[in-house]
């Protein structure tokens, strides 16, 4: 483990929770003056931290522990029947790893995805500045994985390639292609990619039991949840 004791962290004031409307949230951030070192990031991911833009953070709420870090142990994952169908349905897609840059093609897909799938969320309305600040960061471990069908952009999975796994930062996809289940396929592809690169896990962020938008995460089994500072397997 990196010597984390030397790092500084800052907690926000309580603010409205993005996931549970009746709750107040507090967020713990790594000191933004700390360089974004991939090994520090990997160690913090083991402790439940995530990246958003240039910041590493985790929930630090006094009266709530509903946000549970989740990861998929890649080597032990076995797709179920529905997931095998999703893999087969999207076998015609090609995937390319590219550096994170702003393109109107990306933003147009992101905009339509947010407008049609997350118009009730805190990322609505989408803007170019928001998209760039959130996803287009010049970090050596960050990659855009493009999913294309005969040249047409269908999805982009934004991932961080860490020594201990792939961290799934965000995925946006063609909202009119509901039958393909592109969001689920992107996770399945990332599990396969983690195996190909001999990585331990795919980090999915936070699972919240009472948030319907998070329910999909526990459909990947086995999954590991960080409970009382220990990763616990849910089969």
Swiss-Prot record:
This is Aspartate/glutamate leucyltransferase. Its EC number is 2.3.2.29. InterPro entries: Acyl_CoA_acyltransferase (IPR016181), Asp_Glu_LeuTrfase (IPR017138), N-end_Aminoacyl_Trfase (IPR030700), N-end_Aminoacyl_Trfase_C (IPR007472), N-end_Aminoacyl_Trfase_N (IPR007471). One of its GO terms (molecular function) is leucyl-tRNA--protein transferase activity. Belongs to the R-transferase family. Bpt subfamily. One of its GO terms (cellular component) is cytoplasm. It comes from the Bacteria. It catalyses: N-terminal L-glutamyl-[protein] + L-leucyl-tRNA(Leu) = N-terminal L-leucyl-L-glutamyl-[protein] + tRNA(Leu) + H(+); N-terminal L-aspartyl-[protein] + L-leucyl-tRNA(Leu) = N-terminal L-leucyl-L-aspartyl-[protein] + tRNA(Leu) + H(+). The keyword Transferase applies. It is found in: Cytoplasm. Functions in the N-end rule pathway of protein degradation where it conjugates Leu from its aminoacyl-tRNA to the N-termini of proteins containing an N-terminal aspartate or glutamate. One of its GO terms (biological process) is ubiquitin-dependent protein catabolic process via the N-end rule pathway. Keywords: Acyltransferase, Cytoplasm, Transferase.
């Amino acid at each position: 483990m990196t010597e984390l004791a030397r790092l500084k962290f800052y907690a926000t004031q309580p603010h409205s929770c993005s996931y549970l409307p009746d709750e107040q949230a507090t967020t713990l951030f790594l000191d933004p003056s700390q360089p974004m070192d991939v090994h520090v990031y990997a160690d913090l991911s083991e402790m439940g931290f995530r990246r958003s833009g240039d910041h590493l953070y985790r929930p630090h709420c006094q009266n709530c522990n509903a946000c549970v870090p989740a990861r998929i142990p890649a080597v032990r994952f076995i797709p179920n029947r529905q997931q095998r169908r999703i893999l087969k349905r999207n076998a015609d897609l090609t995937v390319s790893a590219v550096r994170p840059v702003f393109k109107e093609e990306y933003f147009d897909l992101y905009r339509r995805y947010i407008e049609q799938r997350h118009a009730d969320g805190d990322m609505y309305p989408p803007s170019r500045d928001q998209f760039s600040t959130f996803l287009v960061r010049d970090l050596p471990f960050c990659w855009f994985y493009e999913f294309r069908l005969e040249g047409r952009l269908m999805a982009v999975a934004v991932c961080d390639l860490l020594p201990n796994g792939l961290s799934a930062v965000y995925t946006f996809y063609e909202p009119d292609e509901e039958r393909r289940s592109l969001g689920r396929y992107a996770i399945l592809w990332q599990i396969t990619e983690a195996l190909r690169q001999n990585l331990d896990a795919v980090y999915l962020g936070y699972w919240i039991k009472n948030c319907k938008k998070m329910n999909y995460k526990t459909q990947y089994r086995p999954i590991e949840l960080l409970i009382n500072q220990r990763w616990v397997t849910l089969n």
